[in-house]
Amino acid sequence: MQVTIDGVPYVPVSNTACSRIGIAISTHNRAGVLSQAMEHQLRHLPAGALVVVVDDGSQPPATVPTSVNLIRHDKSMGIVASKNASLNVLMDAGCEHLFLWDDDAWPIADGWWLPYIESPEPHLSYQFLDLAGARKLNDLAVLYRDDQHIAYTGQRGVMLYYHRS
């Protein structure tokens, strides 16, 4: 459906978002973990999404399915360089919604991207509050909470979301 207001056409996000979603996964020397991540990412993939793996100098080099683009650093440049490479390739591809995943995290349900692209916030993350085992860090506190968002005093994200804006 398209609506025109004062001569300006508007199309609902749900009609266009999937073709402009970009997913980048950073990896380094974890072939088995990356394989699991790829299985889950492709199972719950938004229609038309671009998927990229940034291999940060893995030995042996990472391998990906033919439907996935591979960016490789010949030698490890670190997580920051991998995330920057992820942003660059997704922006260059014209993606509007950018999801940067670590290789040890993945979606577990269809439609996982909808709360992110429907949020008015241009930058969000999925993160864990503390360690799963008996050892606890207890270093994060809740700053803000509403019915859609929680803001913490620190960052421990395994997936970062950015809107192109």
Protein language model annotation of sequence segments:
Residues 53-63, 106:
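A conserved acidic beta->alpha catalytic loop
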Residues 39-48:
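Short, acidic, metal-binding catalytic loop of nucleotide-sugar glycosyltransferases
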Residues 48-57, 71-73:
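Short beta-strand/loop segment that forms part of the nucleotide-sugar
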Residues 1-39:
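N-proximal low-complexity "stem/linker" segments adjacent to membrane-targeting elements
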Residues 62, 83, 109-113:
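Acidic donor-diphosphate engagement hotspot in glycosyltransferases and nucleotidyltransferases
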Residues 108-165:
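Conserved catalytic core of nucleotide-sugar-dependent glycosyltransferases
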Residues 74-90:
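Glycine-rich, basic loop-to-helix element that forms the pyrophosphate-binding segment
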Residues 95-106:
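Short beta-strand-to-loop acidic/aromatic patch adjacent to the donor-nucleotide binding site
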